[in-house]
Design a protein with these regions (language model features):
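Class I S-adenosyl-L-methionine
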Residues: 1-24, 29-123, 223-224, 229, ...
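A contiguous loop/helix-start segment that scaffolds small-molecule binding in enzyme catalytic cores
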Residues: 2-14, 88-92, 148, 156-272
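Class I SAM-dependent methyltransferase SAM-binding "motif I" and its flanking Rossmann-like core
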Residues: 3, 12, 23, 99-171, ...
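Short hydrophobic alpha-helical segments that form membrane-spanning helices or hydrophobic packing faces
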Residues: 27-29, 131-134, 187-188
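Residues at the C-termini of beta-strands that transition into short coil/loop
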Residues: 45, 65, 124-126, 155, ...
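Alpha-helix capping/helix-boundary segments
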Residues: 47-48, 101, 128, 183, ...
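Phosphate- and divalent-cation-binding pockets in alpha/beta enzyme and binding domains
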Residues: 50-51, 104, 130-131, 186-187
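Short hydrophobic/aromatic-enriched beta-strand-loop microsegments
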Residues: 59-66, 119-121, 140-150, 195-204
């Protein structure tokens, strides 16, 4: 990376950096520059190994990640560590998978810094929904199809039942569900309850952008079984299927697209 532009140093105590979904190719130049200037990097578990490999050897690395439905660092511990490290005068990078402002509990960490009168800046990253859609050759919005995009999380069930399920169930709507594997059957039931058809298009993308990325083309009818077969972090795109005509998905080899067993209408009849 010797041809990269020079990066100006910054006086802020903490830089929040979105690392993208996994591949180092999706890291922004600003994010790369922040990593090179850091004294301490506090990172999540969802940060890809390719990105972690870009952290200089002399930089102190602290793993304080969260794992869905598994062992996780307490948010209070993360906040306290941020404040403690930044208070020493070290240049701290808080490295989060995807975009740090989407389901990353960014505000809680900022509030902890503000309470300690510590400065910060935010460097956004590519979020999984954007990269996943690109990897299946689709756009998240399309003129004449959907005038809005919903981004929801299936991890915290508090308030999840109160989502706009009727709106999501409408033909042509697109919703990106983060951390939705374990709530797949609930999602299916709610959408069908509000009028979504069993053959509604669904794509599940596991380990987005990584070497072991897996794309599963499904329907609403097969969503729970498709989700149950995945073992890694995944995003669910409701209302979209992989675009295959003319090899539009340049990155995807045929072996990496799987079709979930159909229990309703054939895949080619699914609504996109």
């Amino acid at each position: 990376m010797s041809n990269l532009p020079a990066f100006a140093s910054t006086a802020v105590a903490v830089t929040f950096v979105g690392a993208g979904p996994g591949a180092a190719a999706h890291l922004t130049l600003a994010a790369y520059g922040a990593l090179q200037q850091a004294d301490v990097v506090i990172h999540d578990r969802l940060v890809g190994p390719e990105v972690l490999a870009l952290i200089p050897a002399h930089v102190v690395r602290i793993d304080l990640g969260k794992q869905g439905f598994g062992p996780s660092a307490l948010q209070t511990t993360i906040n306290a560590t941020l404040v403690a490290q930044a208070s020493t005068g070290a240049r701290v990078v808080r490295l989060k998978g995807g975009d740090c402002g989407i389901f990353g509990r960014l505000d809680e960490e900022i509030e902890a810094l503000e309470a300690a009168q510590l400065s910060f800046r935010i460097l956004p990253g590519l979020t999984s929904a954007a990269v996943a859609a690109a990897n299946i050759g689709q756009s998240l919005t399309r003129r004449g199809r959907n005038a809005a995009l919903r981004i929801v999380t299936g991890h915290d069930m508090v308030g999840f039942a109160d989502q706009d399920w009727r709106g999501m169930a409408q033909p042509g709507e697109v919703t990106a569900v983060y951390m939705g594997k374990k709530s797949a059957r609930f999602i299916q039931g709610r959408l069908m309850m509000h009028g979504a058809l069993p053959d509604t298009a669904v794509t599940l993308i596991e380990n987005v952008s990584r070497a072991d990325e897996r794309i599963v083309a499904a329907t609403l009818a097969t969503l729970p079984d498709a989700a149950a077969a995945l073992t890694g972090p995944a995003i669910i795109l409701l209302g979209l299927l992989p675009r295959r005509a003319g090899h539009a998905v340049a990155k995807i080899k045929a072996t990496r697209i799987q079709e979930a067993p159909l229990q309703a209408a054939p895949l080619q009849e699914a609504r996109t």
